[in-house]
């Protein structure tokens, strides 16, 4: 079956933003204007099409990124039909993992900013993730009708805070309640949207007299940015500033956007139906198609480098980037096709797990509505039914031409809670529910505490775990009670311990056990665990060296201070001995474990705690209360700035997670409910000795 839309007319984009910047409303408008969704879903009344989990509708935040396909022929109907696959991404910091995994499969992103709040903490996180995956982006400054709206301030913030080069291709006509439309700096015309038709109709008009000078000033900056795309254009521009044609400007801006050198910037009010269609045109004009993106890299089963180009003629390759449980069809695996073609019924290789599976039905999603399709091709995003083995980050490919694409990395959880079902009868059901949810979300973990037998759930923040417990009740009918949140401490060492030996000897008639290992242990900040084999002269036979490493790895799970996982240590295996008859893998595993425990005791072990980046927005009158409260929580204030439009102060601080439980309640009472805050995990830092002692004692009492 031939391709309906040429790959050059595909756009795989994400819409990402800080919570409350109006991202879901923007996505809803896109679905409306592209004719997919006939009634605009409003977040205010809990009817948004994209926010399809019940909790999202209640909380008014987007949790799971749903993938949606829409078609667009341009605002004025002057483009050939383009296919836009939109991945909706959450803006709450507890769901950063969702943003991370969608960035991995996108070709371009539209960053939505609040015209008043501007660049907020989550905007910085999302920007970093887009940089990491080299995702070209455009910026849409939303809510231009709000009091305090300031398009140009957001433009400056993108430069100052995000180090991005934002190039306005529009400027607003009016602001706050006088916001009417935009000036298109490429065409040098004003665009005014008609309220009666919900913005479907619009007119091009002359630029209002009071904006002509400003429009010329910003057009000049835009054309200059475009001219830097090539020597020829620059020369042409320097000869005559007005010599670049509309097509030349667009092509040059596109080239520089795809190279991640600039970020074209637009504005509007999605809620007031202004500016969204022009943003869709910009998606087509400036963001890449799958064909504009470099070939994706991976390696074959022999670890040789391999690549796949975005073409139907290449062998099939795809990445599973999300798993969801659907009440009607069971497990859905969302995947992005990088190359080749696959039909329902074909056999695929899951190269990551080296298992073959038959592809059942293929569904294309529109939020939570679905359409069954026969095949998918390079550049498509779809959902598969019937893949039992696939999990997030797995590569699916042609069994005859295997490739493993680069895996996704997921952060370690920072908070955990004990959880138990309200009725004993639900124990098994709870286990199944938690395992299913952990399969869907790689940043959520479930384990059993070996000492207490309790089920422990871990995640990226309090809201993350709240929603897991909530989903367990709604989707699986299991009500659970949760314990107090516990901080995920870590242990590491401060100094070097050399020549530490571990000897495991059991010789009591018959075959004995003998393992002897000597190690050096040193700090390895920020690099995790490393094991170096420095054995010379065969004092430990080759086949037993992995056993020493295994023994140490098992011991890393529980440190010597308080039984927390050990991180950032480097172990050198330097010496040892063996017995011809009695040595075996188990003996060397035990020797490695004993040596490591002893070395850790000697190397000044310390406790590490997660530090959170906290930002508080508060009216100025309560500034003292907020600062005092943060200091009492061992917080270090790192900066303050005015919120534009007389909106109070923004305080940035770094605070230990252990001190942040219950913060929202105390912030409310300290500021009469007028302050808001966000926090996200920053890094691990050494715990002060008095806190460390308290944590260790509490752990020992718990064990005792």
From Swiss-Prot:
Protein location: Cytoplasm
Any single GO CC term annotated in Swiss-Prot or TrEMBL for this entry: cytoplasm
Residues reported in the UniProt entry to bind GTP: 17-24, 88-92, 142-145
Domain of life per record: Bacteria
Main location: cytoplasm
Pfam families recorded: EFG_C, EFG_III, EFG_IV, GTP_EFTU, GTP_EFTU_D2
Domain tr-type G: 8-291
NCBIfam families documented for this protein: EF-G, PRK12740.1-5, small_GTP
The protein's name in its UniProt record: Elongation factor G 1
Lineage: Bacteria, Pseudomonadati, Pseudomonadota, Betaproteobacteria, Burkholderiales
């Amino acid at each position: 079956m031939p391709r309906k839309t040429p790959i050059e007319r595909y756009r795989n984009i994400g819409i990402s933003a800080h919570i409350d910047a109006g991202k879901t409303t923007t996505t809803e408008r896109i679905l409306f204007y592209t004719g997919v969704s006939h009634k605009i879903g409003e977040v205010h009344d809990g009817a948004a099409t994209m926010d399809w989990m019940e909790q999202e509708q209640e909380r008014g935040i987007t949790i799971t990124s749903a993938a949606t396909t829409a078609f667009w022929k341009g605002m004025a109907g002057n483009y050939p039909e383009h296919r836009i696959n939109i991945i909706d991404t959450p803006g709450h910091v507890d769901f950063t993992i969702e943003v991370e995994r969608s960035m991995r499969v996108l070709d371009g992103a539209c960053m939505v900013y609040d015209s008043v709040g501007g660049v907020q903490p989550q905007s910085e996180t999302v920007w970093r993730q887009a940089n990491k995956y080299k995702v070209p982006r455009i910026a849409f400054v939303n809510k231009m009708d709000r009091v305090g709206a300031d398009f140009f301030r957001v433009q400056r913030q993108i430069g100052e805070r995000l180090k991005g080069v934002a190039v306005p291709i529009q400027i607003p006509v009016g602001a706050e309640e006088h916001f009417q439309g935009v000036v298109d700096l490429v065409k040098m015309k004003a665009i005014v949207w008609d309220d009666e038709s919900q913005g479907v109709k619009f007119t091009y008009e002359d630029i209002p007299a009071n904006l002509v000078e400003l429009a010329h000033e910003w057009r000049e900056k835009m054309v200059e940015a475009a001219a830097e795309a090539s020597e020829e254009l620059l020369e042409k521009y320097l000869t005559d500033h007005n010599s670049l044609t509309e097509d030349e400007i667009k092509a040059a801006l596109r080239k520089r956007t795809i190279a991640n050198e600039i970020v074209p910037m637009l504005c509007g009010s999605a809620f007031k139906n202004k500016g969204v269609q022009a943003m869709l045109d910009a998606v087509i004009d400036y963001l890449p198609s799958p064909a504009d993106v470099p070939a994706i890299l991976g390696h074959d089963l022999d670890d040789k480098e391999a690549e796949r180009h975005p073409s139907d003629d290449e062998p099939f390759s795809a990445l599973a980037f999300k798993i969801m449980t659907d009440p009607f069809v069971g497990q859905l695996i969302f995947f992005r096709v990088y190359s080749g073609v696959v039909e329902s019924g074909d056999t695929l290789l899951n190269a990551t797990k080296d298992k073959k599976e038959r592809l059942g039905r293929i569904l294309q999603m529109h939020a939570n509505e679905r359409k069954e399709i026969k095949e998918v091709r390079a550049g498509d995003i779809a959902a598969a039914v019937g893949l039992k083995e696939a999990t997030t980050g797995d590569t699916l490919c042609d069994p005859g031409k295997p490739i493993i694409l680069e895996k996704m990395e997921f952060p370690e959880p920072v908070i955990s809670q004990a959880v138990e079902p309200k009725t004993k009868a639900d124990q098994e059901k709870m286990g199944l529910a938690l395992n299913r949810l952990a399969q869907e979300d790689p940043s959520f973990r479930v384990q059993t505490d070996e000492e207490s037998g309790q089920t422990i759930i871990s995640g990226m923040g309090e809201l993350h775990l709240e929603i897991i417990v909530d989903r367990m009740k709604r989707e699986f009918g299991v009500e659970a009670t949760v314990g107090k949140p516990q901080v995920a401490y870590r242990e590491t060492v401060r100094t070097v311990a050399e020549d530490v030996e571990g000897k495991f000897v059991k010789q009591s008639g018959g075959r004995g056990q003998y393992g002897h290992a000597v190690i050096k242990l040193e700090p390895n900040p920020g690099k995790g665990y490393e094991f170096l084999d420095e054995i010379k002269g065969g004092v430990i036979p080759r086949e037993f060296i992995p056993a020493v490493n295994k023994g140490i790895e098992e011991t890393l799970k529980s440190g010597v201070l308080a039984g927390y996982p050990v991180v950032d240590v480097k172990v050198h295996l330097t010496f040892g001995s063996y017995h011809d008859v009695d040595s075996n893998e188990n003996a060397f595993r035990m020797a490695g474990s004993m040596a490591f425990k002893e070395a850790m005791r000697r190397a000044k072990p310390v406790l590490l705690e997660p530090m959170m980046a906290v930002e508080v927005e508060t009216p100025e009158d309560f500034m003292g209360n907020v600062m005092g409260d943060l200091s009492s929580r061992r917080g270090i204030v790192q900066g303050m700035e005015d919120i534009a439009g007389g909106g109070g102060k923004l305080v940035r601080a770094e605070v230990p997670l252990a001190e942040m439980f219950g913060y929202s309640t105390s912030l409310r009472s300290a500021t009469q409910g007028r302050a808001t805050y966000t926090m996200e995990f920053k890094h691990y830092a050494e715990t002060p000795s008095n806190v460390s002692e308290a944590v260790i004692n509490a752990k020992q009492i718990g064990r005792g």
